[in-house]
């Protein structure tokens, strides 16, 4: 990895590369900053200009992925310390990309306009006209694909990158919403429908991830009113853009998003916002041909629009839309609950409800309704709000014809002019088709109450009032009747032979769904009761008649009934009072529980927020401390350098000053070697010397001045009296002249003042009148101000009292909380102390056991060492005795025969190769110097000593055989002791001299070590 370069150096290098046209190399140089290990420790003040230049190069070179990686790295560095920096960089990034799109669009427009025209008088030739009719705007589309589309794609990727970087961070929430709104405007401006769908998915995914990242330090809190309001504003902008782009599915999904956010809001949204919500929802329902919920949306919109300041014309228009949308709801599809179908089996209703319940429930919840709306309910609510008075006159007439009057033979002719008038309005023309369905339904309902059968030609004559394009054919009328029968609203039979329509009415028929008949009766205008209705209500009518007769014959029955009714009412009131008290108690209990739960949740949230803030504060303090330490260190280094420079400069100045005075003569080398203290000392000495010289000179001057001053005073004494007399005469003359001048000036001023008083006396009444007016006015203003000030003081006093009460209550709560935390901390500290004491006791026991084991091991080692030392001492004593015997025999004995030498050699070999000790124990290392000092060194030393004595190994008489070497005791012997024992036992030196060893063996023997056989340790039970 290359060494880390300073950000200023990298930026300067990139600027140089850009100036010579190497933009790619400049981008690579800037990108190396993000891969460095010290990137996170770099100050943001140095990184921000680098990021701006990096973004410029990425936009120029269309490096969207590289820009995303760099911005992500910069976000990780700056989000905890300076969120405004990343906001500035991302806005700069979006601004540059948008500028590139605008520039490309202008180039494309210019390219399309630059069409070569050979003949200015005939710019449009027949060939060009034919080609233009075939190719349309292919030239412009091709130019846009080449110039504009790549930059549009880059701008779209820039918006996605910005949203991905700014998401799910409370500090970056405001720029996130701004970028989201800009992205929506981008899709709307350039009609990017596909990108709009993807943008909606991205925003929806980010909102779903809010709960996943809720444990982060800077997570988004949707319970905060400002945050939720920003999300709502963005979703409303998304809804408006979807409606403008006519993406109705996305608009509906946006409505669901808004509804989900509204359910989370603790405070009701603004009426204007909700009015916009219902207006867009009404447009969506109109496009989806859902007339029932379209009318319900208009109804909800009107309820909010009344509270918004609008003109009378706007109120009339909105009321007209509410009324016509409710009238346009088809009667067939809105009568029965859910679907409104009549005369269906139970399974049919269950299947239909199962299919439509979820959809209807969703739509109902989106409108904020408690139950599914119906046509009758919407019309009733419209009447309760006096919409008929505010709606247009033709719509009021339409309502009367459809819902109030009964005229089956003229209903079509009366409604046709109204529908023609409505068709002229472009906004209301879309209600004409559903209104025709309502008119036909009302026509057949009213005909069924008057006729048992009617000719199809008669029906065609009645509907012939409708003009094209809303005219009907017999096939369409038949299809409508079959549809009404299929949905259970009408009971009609068509006779194709007689070309007639028969209205069937079964006297004993009943509705399968209990709510169907009630709904049908509410929507239908009845002239008379049908036979089935008469049969169905016969018992109720008979009971009513008998009850009326009894009350007429015996009035006491009515009195008893009223008394019983009053008694029942009294009992009901008492029971209701008890139930009311129980309900209040239960409500208070639930409220208290809810309050406790909210308090616990608030406390938990506050503690979590405090913990997050504490962690963030600790991290920020650590970072600030590190930065402060680095700054302090740099400042200290700078101060040290400055102090050193100042010290050197002062030393130079001081030395120069001393040289200029002439009392100090120093060379350049001496000046360089002297420090400030020495120079100060020299300067002090120089100053003391100058002071002494100055004092001596002053003493001489004073002595001379004393004599001179005495002579001066002796001469001036006679002249002082004459000068005093002259001064008195001059002072007297000056005093007289000044007094005369003062008197004259006072007289002139007095005369002028009298003249001024004479002139001002004429305006004195006006002055006094004006003064009284001004004083009265000022006095009134003063009293008003004093009254207001008094009121303000009282308000401030009351506010201060309330503030003091709040502060005392808060202090009391804080004291209680502090006491609770103190008790908890004491308990935790006590538990920690007990745990630490238990662990310390356990450690002491373990250490005592470990010390006891170590003492036992140490005693065993010392015991073994003492045994080994005693054995070694005995062995050394025996070796010393053997060496003494050998020396005593060395003078009179000769060399042994070859056989004895071989036998002795074999004996020595056997002694050397004795088995190794069974226990491997630590022994003292051999001391070769001690062995040589005792006379039992190597064979070369012994051979040299023998030759020096003049002995001959071959001519020496044979000595008696030495005693065999003692068997090995199994203990380890150092090399010194083994050599001594071998010499004493068999005369190893003599045998070596008599039988020379090979060079390899001699080299092996010269190292001073003895070969020891290595045996494998076996336990006592397994030894052979």
Curated annotation (Swiss-Prot):
Gene3D superfamilies under this entry?
1.25.40.860, UVR domain
Q: Does the keyword Cell membrane apply?
A: no
Pfam families documented for this protein? eIF3a_PCI_TPR-like, PCI
What taxonomic lineage is listed for the species of origin? Eukaryota, Fungi, Dikarya, Basidiomycota, Ustilaginomycotina
What spans are recorded as compositionally biased (Basic and acidic residues)? 797-866, 873-886
Under the cellular component aspect of Gene Ontology, which terms does the record hold?
cytoplasmic stress granule; eukaryotic 43S preinitiation complex; eukaryotic 48S preinitiation complex; eukaryotic translation initiation factor 3 complex, eIF3e; eukaryotic translation initiation factor 3 complex, eIF3m; multi-eIF complex
Function, please?
Answer: RNA-binding component of the eukaryotic translation initiation factor 3 (eIF-3) complex, which is involved in protein synthesis of a specialized repertoire of mRNAs and, together with other initiation factors, stimulates binding of mRNA and methionyl-tRNAi to the 40S ribosome. The eIF-3 complex specifically targets and initiates translation of a subset of mRNAs involved in cell proliferation.
**In the record, what terms sit under GO molecular function?**
mRNA binding; translation initiation factor activity
Record keywords, A-Z: Coiled coil, Cytoplasm, Initiation factor, Protein biosynthesis, RNA-binding
Q: Does the keyword Protein biosynthesis apply?
A: yes
Coiled-coil stretches noted in the UniProt entry, renumbered to this chain: 575-717, 777-889
The protein, known as: Eukaryotic translation initiation factor 3 subunit A
**Cellular location of this protein?**
Cytoplasm
* Assembly and binders: Component of the eukaryotic translation initiation factor 3 (eIF-3) complex.
- What family is this? Belongs to the eIF-3 subunit A family.
Q: Source organism's superkingdom?
A: Eukaryota
**Residue intervals passing through the bilayer:** none
Compositional bias per record (Low complexity), positions renumbered to this chain: 890-906, 946-971
The PCI domain is annotated at 331-508
Query: Which GO terms fall under biological process for this protein?
Result: formation of cytoplasmic translation initiation complex; translation reinitiation
What PANTHER family does the database record attribute to this sequence?
A: EUKARYOTIC TRANSLATION INITIATION FACTOR 3 SUBUNIT A, EUKARYOTIC TRANSLATION INITIATION FACTOR 3, THETA SUBUNIT
Note the InterPro entries from the entry: EIF3A, eIF3a_PCI_TPR-like, PCI_dom
């Amino acid at each position: 990895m290359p060494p880390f370069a300073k950000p200023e150096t990298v930026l300067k290098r990139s600027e140089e590369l850009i100036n010579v046209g190497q933009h790619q190399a400049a981008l690579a140089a800037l990108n190396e900053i993000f891969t460095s290990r010290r990137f996170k420790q770099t100050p943001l003040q140095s990184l921000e200009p680098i990021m701006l230049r990096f973004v410029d190069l990425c936009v120029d070179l269309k490096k969207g992925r590289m820009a995303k990686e760099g911005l992500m790295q910069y976000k990780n560095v700056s989000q905890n310390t300076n969120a405004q920096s990343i906001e500035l960089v991302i806005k700069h990034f979006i601004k540059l990309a948008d500028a590139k799109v605008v520039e490309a669009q202008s180039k494309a427009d210019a390219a399309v306009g630059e069409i070569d025209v050979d003949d200015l008088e005939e710019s449009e030739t027949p060939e060009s006209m034919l080609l233009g009719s075939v190719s349309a705007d292919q030239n412009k589309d091709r130019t846009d694909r080449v110039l504009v589309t790549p930059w549009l794609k880059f701008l779209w990727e820039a918006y996605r990158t910005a949203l991905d970087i700014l998401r799910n961070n409370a500090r970056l929430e405001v720029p996130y919403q701004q970028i989201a709104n800009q992205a929506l405007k981008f899709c709307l401006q350039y009609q990017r429908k596909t990108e709009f769908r993807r943008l909606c998915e991205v925003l929806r995914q980010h909102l779903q991830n809010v709960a996943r990242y809720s444990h982060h330090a800077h997570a988004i809190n949707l319970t905060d009113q400002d945050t939720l309001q920003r999300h709502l504003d963005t979703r409303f902008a998304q809804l408006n853009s979807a409606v403008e782009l006519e993406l109705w599915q996305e608009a509906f999904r946006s409505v669901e998003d808004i509804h989900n956010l509204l359910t989370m809001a603790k405070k009701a949204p603004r009426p204007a916002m909700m009015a916009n919500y219902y207006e867009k929802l009404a447009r969506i329902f109109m496009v989806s041909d859902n007339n029932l919920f379209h009318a319900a949306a208009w109804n909800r919109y009107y309820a909010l629009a009344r509270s918004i300041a609008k003109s009378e014309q706007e109120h009339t228009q909105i009321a007209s839309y509410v009324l016509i949308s409710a009238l346009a709801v088809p009667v067939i599809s809105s009568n029965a609950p859910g679907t409104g179908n009549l005369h269906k089996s139970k399974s049919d209703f269950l299947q239909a409800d199962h299919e439509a319940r979820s959809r209807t429930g969703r739509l109902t919840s989106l409108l904020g309704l408690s139950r599914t709306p119906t046509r009758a309910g919407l019309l009733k609510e419209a009447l309760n709000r006096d919409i008929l008075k505010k709606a247009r006159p033709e719509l009021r007439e339409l309502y009367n014809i459809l819902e109030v009057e009964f005229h089956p033979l003229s209903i079509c002719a009366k409604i046709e002019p109204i529908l023609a008038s409505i068709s002229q309005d472009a906004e209301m023309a879309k209600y004409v088709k559903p209104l025709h369905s309502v008119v036909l339904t009302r026509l057949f309902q009213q005909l069924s109450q008057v006729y048992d059968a009617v000719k199809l030609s008669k029906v065609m004559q009645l509907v012939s009032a409708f003009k094209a394009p809303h005219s009907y054919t017999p096939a369409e009328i038949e299809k409508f009747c079959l549809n009404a029968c299929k949905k259970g609203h009408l009971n009609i039979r068509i006779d194709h032979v007689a070309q007639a329509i028969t209205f069937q009415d079964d006297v004993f028929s009943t509705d399968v769904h209990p709510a169907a008949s009630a709904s049908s009766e509410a929507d239908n205008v009845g002239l008379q009761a049908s036979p089935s209705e008469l049969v169905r209500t016969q018992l109720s009518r008979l009971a009513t008649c008998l009850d009326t007769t009894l009350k007429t014959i015996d009035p006491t029955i009515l009195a008893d009934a009223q008394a019983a009714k009053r008694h029942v009412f009294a009992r009901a009131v008492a029971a209701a009072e008890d139930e009311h008290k129980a309900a209040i108690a239960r409500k208070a209990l639930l409220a208290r529980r809810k309050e406790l739960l909210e308090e616990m949740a608030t406390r938990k949230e506050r503690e979590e927020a405090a913990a997050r803030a504490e962690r963030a504060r600790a991290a920020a303090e650590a970072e600030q401390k590190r930065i402060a330490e680095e700054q302090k260190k740099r400042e200290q280094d700078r101060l040290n350098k400055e102090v050193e420079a100042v010290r050197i400069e002062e030393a130079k100045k001081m030395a120069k000053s001393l040289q200029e005075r002439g009392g100090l003569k120093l060379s350049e080398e001496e000046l360089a070697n002297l420090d400030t203290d020495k120079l100060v000392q020299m300067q002090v000495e120089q100053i003391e010397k100058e002071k002494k010289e100055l004092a001596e000179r002053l003493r001489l001057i004073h002595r001379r001045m004393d004599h001179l001053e005495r002579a001066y005073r002796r001469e001036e004494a006679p002249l002082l009296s004459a000068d005093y007399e002259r001064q008195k005469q001059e002072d007297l003359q000056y005093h007289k002249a000044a007094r005369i001048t003062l008197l004259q000036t006072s007289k002139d001023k007095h005369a002028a003042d009298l003249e001024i008083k004479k002139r001002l006396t004429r305006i004195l009444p006006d002055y006094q009148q004006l003064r009284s007016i001004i004083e009265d006015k000022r006095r009134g203003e003063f009293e008003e101000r004093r009254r207001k000030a008094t009121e303000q003081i009282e308000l401030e006093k009351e506010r201060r009292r309330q503030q003091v009460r709040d502060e005392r209550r808060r202090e009391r709560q804080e004291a209680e909380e502090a006491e609770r935390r103190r008790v908890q901390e004491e308990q935790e500290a006590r538990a920690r102390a007990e745990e630490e004491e238990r662990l310390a006791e356990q450690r002491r026991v373990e250490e005592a056991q470990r010390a006891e084991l170590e003492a036992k091991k140490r005693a065993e080692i010392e015991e073994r060492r003492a045994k080994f030392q005693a054995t070694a001492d005995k062995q050394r004593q025996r070796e010393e005795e053997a060496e003494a015997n050998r020396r005593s025999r060395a003078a009179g004995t000769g060399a042994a025969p070859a056989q004895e030498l071989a036998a002795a050699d074999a004996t020595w070999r056997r002694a050397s190769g004795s088995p190794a000790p069974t226990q491997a124990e630590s022994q003292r290392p051999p001391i070769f110097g001690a062995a040589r000092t005792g006379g039992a060194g190597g064979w070369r030393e012994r051979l040299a000593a023998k030759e020096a004595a003049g002995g001959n190994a071959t001519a020496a008489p044979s000595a008696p055989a030495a005693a065999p070497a003692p068997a090995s005791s199994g203990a380890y012997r150092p090399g010194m002791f083994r050599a001594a024992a071998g010499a004493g036992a068999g005369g190893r030196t003599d045998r070596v001299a008599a039988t020379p060893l090979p060079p390899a063996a001699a080299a092996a023997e010269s190292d001073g070590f003895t070969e020891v056989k290595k045996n494998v340790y076996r336990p006592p039970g397994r030894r052979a």
